[in-house]
Amino acid sequence: MHTGGEPLRIVTDGFPKPDGKTILQKRRFVKEKLDNFRKLLMHEPRGHYDMYGALLVEPDIEDADIAVLFMDNRSYSTMCGHAVIALGRYATDYGYVRPTEPETKVNIECPCGLVKALVEYKNGKSGSVRFQSVPAFVFATDVELNVQGHGKVKVDISYGGAFYAFISADKLGLDLWKTPINQIKDAATMVTNAVKNEVQLEHPDDNDLAFIYGTIVTDGKDEYSDEPTANICVFADAQVDRSPTGSGVTARTALQYHKRHISLNKSRVFVNARIGSKFSAKPVRQTKCGSYDAVIIEVSGHAFYTGKSAFTFEEDDPLKGGFLLK
């Protein structure tokens, strides 16, 4: 499937069953013991540098209809909004839930927590999906970093199921629409590396959630407007999201709410600056995450089917483990 151009390879069979009582334990087990399967599915020659995957596992939350581990070119994310949108349709269409009109509810257990998706359903066909995030919050604003090639810059850090750094393109001397994408990718990666080196992240629920997943370069238009606001997300190992980034839009909306640029139940459109794909998002209610003031964000988008595949490897294949070209 794809959501806004960002691929999602849903793994339904053939992957060894991960040990663990909780989804974070299963994530840790797959990361430590079964990572060769991620590389086989995500990397060339079966995948590519920017491939993204979702492994369906047994839920450990009673209310969950499905549970998922996310995977990318480097490791395993704790949340992925574009994947949740796709999985909402998939669960509705493949019998994980009973379809109901006008919307079908799908509870998806993610490593960051339970995410509730609502899938449009009419005349036997699923459509667009909206989901409500886990509590999203701002970790810090105006964090000064020493960024290789750019000197001292300030970023905001916000959580939307995963942690992201936010910076406007002009602060890096970039044009979000015209600068070659590799230059944006390199600059964003340097920002992410600086956060890793200089900022100690924390999450109230679990230390496994306390890592920087990527940097989102924006157009700087955070004041509320009916006009779309653009961004590009660079995550994992310099992977470029083709969609506006579901968890990133969640974190960015939480940041805008924190700065009083947007109010509850006001919807904003977010667009990928290069692909043109769009998500909409709105803060729907206040909450807490530990001691942090948090907000639940509702994100909407549409996913589409792209095909079915069965992957194999031969033992004598010298490249059976996969590879990446940088």
UniProtKB/Swiss-Prot annotation:
It catalyses: trans-3-hydroxy-L-proline = 1-pyrroline-2-carboxylate + H2O. This is Trans-L-3-hydroxyproline dehydratase. The active site is at C80 (proton acceptor). The lineage of its organism: Eukaryota, Metazoa, Hemichordata, Enteropneusta, Harrimaniidae. It is an enzyme of class 4 (lyase). Its EC number is 4.2.1.77. Catalyzes the dehydration of trans-3-hydroxy-L-proline to delta-1-pyrroline-2-carboxylate (Pyr2C). Substrate binds at G81, H82, D241, G246, S247. It comes from Saccoglossus kowalevskii (Acorn worm). The keyword Disulfide bond does not apply. Signal peptide: none annotated.
